[in-house]
């Protein structure tokens, strides 16, 4: 939580000990958020619907919490919100190429200028890859784990 706040987040939620729906409602004066980018899915969908604003968008980009779920469609409809699922893998090669080129032309310059910067938790030499893997498996990282390859 402290690390995320230090990166500049206006509102931080520890989902293991706080109800993120209540936190979002309180932080937005009950209006909800405009966009939710969800990599978990599963049981989070109902809570995401509770957090979304009128005309908001939920973009499902992963299903780490499970791909099958039941949710209250009746809660989504009055908000006139949309739920979009997307993955890169299922897209045609031409579309993947176009997206990669757009990323290179629009996003990479933001990293090069310093406007965006990756959050790196730790760096490991290639010879310590097993240690890096164990660290990742412990789920204690905040940000990316980088493996340096001498070359």
Describe the predicted segments one by one:
Residues 13, 34-38, 61-62, 96, ...:
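Glycine- and other small-residue-rich loops at beta-strand/loop junctions that grip anionic moieties
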Residues 9, 32-33, 76, 116, ...:
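Local beta-strand N-terminus motif with an aromatic residue
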Residues 1-47:
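Adenosine-nucleotide cofactor-binding segment
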Residues 124-132, 145-151:
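A short, charged, Gly/Pro-tolerant segment at domain boundaries
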């Amino acid at each position: 939580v402290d690390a995320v706040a230090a990166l500049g987040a206006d509102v931080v939620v520890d989902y293991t000990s706080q109800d993120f729906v209540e936190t979002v409602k309180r932080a937005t004066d009950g209006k909800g958020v405009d966009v939710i980018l969800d990599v978990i899915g599963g049981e989070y969908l109902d809570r995401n619907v509770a957090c979304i604003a009128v005309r908001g968008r939920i973009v499902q980009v992963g299903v780490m919490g499970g791909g099958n779920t039941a949710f209250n469609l009746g809660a989504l409809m009055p908000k006139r919100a949309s739920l979009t699922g997307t993955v890169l893998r299922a897209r045609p090669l031409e579309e993947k190429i176009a997206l990669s080129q757009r990323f290179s032309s629009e996003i990479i310059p933001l990293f090069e200028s310093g406007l965006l910067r990756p959050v790196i938790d730790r760096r490991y030499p290639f010879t310590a890859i097993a240690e890096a893997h164990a660290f990742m498996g412990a789920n204690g990282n905040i940000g990316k784990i980088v493996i340096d390859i001498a070359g």
